[in-house]
């Protein structure tokens, strides 16, 4: 007999309330991206995304297969793939997913792939490392990135972003402010 049954209940009203709370803190034109990776952190990404599809501007997933699942669930909102893998570029393009590009190898590989498929101006998002030190371009990469992208009409930069480390920790506030300054310089 299993006495260890867990149930997770998701409240649409609570999600909407939380989303509105954050929107009220932001500039009116600021776009909202909802991260629904890892099966919506255990809450069924497709259902959460379906609920939010008209309330956010973007979704983010970790891998292409998660974005494909959203497309199969009839989610047409743009989807950022945080960890695109070179072997999945065909599926990313076929499903109109947008890759996060965080190193020169992936940038060059995606441009080569787009060129082979005769695709022009495919939207990409550039990730910069400002302190987390996991993935991301460095400021020193900017001239080479610009040279590569400006000499190609196969991709277009849709956004640049970073992932702040320890931003939730008030003891790390100086570090967080330094990361923000690094991003502004980029």
Give the location of each predicted region.
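Alpha-helical packing segments of well-folded alpha/beta enzyme cores
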Residues: 15-18, 22, 186
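Active-site-proximal beta-alpha core segment in soluble small-molecule metabolic enzymes
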Residues: 2, 7-10, 14, 30-182
């Amino acid at each position: 007999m299993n006495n260890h049954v867990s149930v997770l209940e998701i409240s649409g009203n609570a999600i909407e309330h939380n989303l509105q709370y954050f929107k009220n803190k932001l500039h009116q034109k600021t776009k909202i991206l909802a991260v629904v990776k890892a099966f919506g952190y255990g809450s069924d990404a497709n259902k959460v995304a379906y609920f939010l599809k008209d309330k956010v501007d973007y979704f983010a997933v970790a891998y292409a297969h998660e974005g494909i699942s959203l497309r199969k669930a009839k989610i047409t909102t743009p989807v950022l793939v945080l960890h695109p893998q070179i072997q999945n570029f065909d599926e990313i393009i076929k499903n109109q997913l947008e890759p996060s590009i965080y190193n020169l190898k992936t940038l060059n590989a995606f441009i080569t792939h787009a060129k082979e498929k005769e695709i022009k101006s495919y939207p990409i998002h550039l990730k910069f490392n400002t302190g987390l030190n996991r993935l991301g371009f460095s400021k020193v990469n900017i001239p080479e990135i610009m040279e590569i992208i400006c000499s190609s009409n196969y991709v277009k930069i849709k956004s640049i972003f970073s992932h702040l480390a320890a931003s939730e920790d008030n003891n790390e506030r100086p570090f967080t402010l330094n990361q923000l300054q690094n991003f502004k310089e980029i």
